[in-house]
C-alpha cells in the first residue's frame, strides 16, 4: 500500500514533504523502518475510477487529476498473487525491470516510492458546448487551441535509467514553468521525469505513457492559448481514451473573457 491511498489527497507537495520526513526517520534508524529493493522505477500502480477537472488561478488552464479515490493498487510488496501478477505485467509493459533501488518501507507501506496509474492514454480530446470562434463551433475539437503540459519518467526508463532531464524555465513554455513551480521543481534540478510541452493537437500516444511527476496528481494541464470571441461560460469537456479502449470524460464550467 502507498502513502497516496492513506491520505486520499491530491496535493503532491504534501506527499513529498511527508515522504521526506519519513525518509529522514529511516536514516536515523527507526526500528520499524526497513529498506527494500524495488526492481522497477514505478513501485506502485493504481486503478482510477475517473477524472476530475479543476481550473487554475489564471482561469485559462484546466488541471486534470484522477477523481478522488481509486479501487485497486499493485506494487512490488503485493502479497496477493493476482495483484503481484498485474504489477509484474505493467512493469514488463513499460520495460521497467532493472532499476533495483532501495525504497523506505514502514510497516508494509512504501512511503517514498513512485506511483502512477495502471492505464496509459491513447488520445485526448477537448470540446466546448458553445461556439469558441468561427473555426471552432460547439462540439468540435479544441485541441489545436490547447497547450498540453505534463511530466513522465517513460523516457528515463526507456533509456535504461540513464537519461535525466536538467530543468530550466528558459527551455519550456510559461505554462510548463507554472506547473513545475506548483510541483516544487527548481531551476537546474536533475529530473527523472521529462516534460511534455506541446499543443494538444501534436500530442501522440507515446507522449501519454506514465503521466505524472512521480505521482498522478496532476496527470496533466491544458492551457487555452486563445480566448473565445464572446465572453461567458463554456462547459469544457475533456475526453481521454486509454490504450485499452476505455473512455473517461469529465466536464467543467469555465468563465472566459473574450479576446481582442
Where are the language model's segments positioned?
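Non-catalytic macromolecular-recognition regions in eukaryotic signaling proteins
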Residues: 31-260
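N-terminal secretory signal peptides that target proteins for export/translocation
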Residues: 1-12
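C-terminal motif of bacterial Sec signal peptides marking the signal peptidase cleavage site
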Residues: 26-29
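Sec-dependent signal peptide recognition
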Residues: 13-20
